[in-house]
A protein has these predicted regions:
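Short loop/turn segments at strand-loop or loop-helix junctions that form parts
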Residues: 10, 43-46
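Short, flexible/disordered intra-domain loops and linkers
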Residues: 18-22, 49-61
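Active-site regions of metal-assisted phosphoester/phosphodiester hydrolases
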Residues: 1-39, 70-71, 75-254
């Protein structure tokens, strides 16, 4: 029985470095594989782009999702949010365990910025109730984020049983640090880094993190360990640091 889960969240910046200068997906996959996470929450996954597939010789023929999952994460889910003539990008989940159901909800607050909430139910061996894993990437403007957070809390209330183990992770763009209060009051969740270290992690920019934009919110778990993966090497990988957490399921959780 898997009482302990290792999870990661990472905004991969569409698989390229700043200003689309270099292709970074191979470095990103190598880093993810070394972490050996059970479930990975990804944002800005560009699964198709006609121009980049021609420009970058190493662009995977199978698409970014299948390339990242490889053999380590046999199950994956992709939520297409933003579409354009050359392709599309969105949120994604990689899982070592079977994903039994996935829904991508549209939580866009404005026509100019498409956003989604990717919700997957995962069968973890030995658990009698699925893990609910939700990946989000919220908007750049506070007004839009407020609307999106309301959508997220309402959707979770409708689609996630109150007793179910729940993880919400991703890029919240939450400059005002309001998400934690909203999730605590409405969903009974807490942020992993805040519980373990007192404050959410600094995750942006990755080479010298200052802003606390990326989060991991949990319900039904103890937080055993958290870590920010950042530093100079991330200049060639992504503008966001990667966050990981080791979570232990609460014994009396169904």
């Amino acid at each position: 029985m898997h009482n302990t889960l290792r999870i990661a969240t990472f905004n991969i910046h569409k698989g390229v470095t700043h200003f689309n200068a270099r292709f970074a997906l191979h470095h990103q996959r190598d880093l993810l594989r070394r972490l050996q996470a059970d479930v990975v929450f990804l944002q800005e996954v560009r699964d198709e782009h006609a121009e980049h597939s021609k420009r970058f010789a190493a662009w995977p023929e199978t698409g970014q999702m299948e390339y990242l999952s490889n053999a380590l994460w046999p199950d994956y889910a992709y939520g297409k949010n933003s579409t354009y003539p050359a392709g599309h990008h969105g949120n994604a989940l990689l899982s070592k365990f079977p994903i039994i159901k996935t829904t991508n909800f549209d939580i866009s607050a404005h026509a100019s910025e498409q956003r989604g909430m990717l919700h997957s139910e995962i069968n973890v061996p030995g658990w009698d109730i699925p893990l609910h894993a939700i990946c989000v990437h919220l908007g750049l403007f506070a007004k839009w984020r407020r609307e999106q957070l309301l959508s997220v809390t309402n959707l979770i209330a409708q689609h996630v049983p109150a007793e179910a183990p729940l993880i919400i992770a991703g890029d919240f763009n939450d400059w005002g640090m309001r998400t934690g209060r909203i999730f605590a009051e409405n969903l009974g969740m807490h942020e992993a880094f805040e519980q373990h270290a007192g404050k959410p992690a600094r995750s942006f920019p990755s080479w010298l993190p200052i802003l606390r934009l990326d989060r991991i919110y949990v319900r039904g778990f103890h937080v055993k360990h958290v870590e920010v993966h950042s530093g100079a090497k991330f200049v060639k990988i992504s503008d966001h640091a990667m966050l990981t957490a080791i979570l232990t399921r609460v014994p009396n959780s169904p």
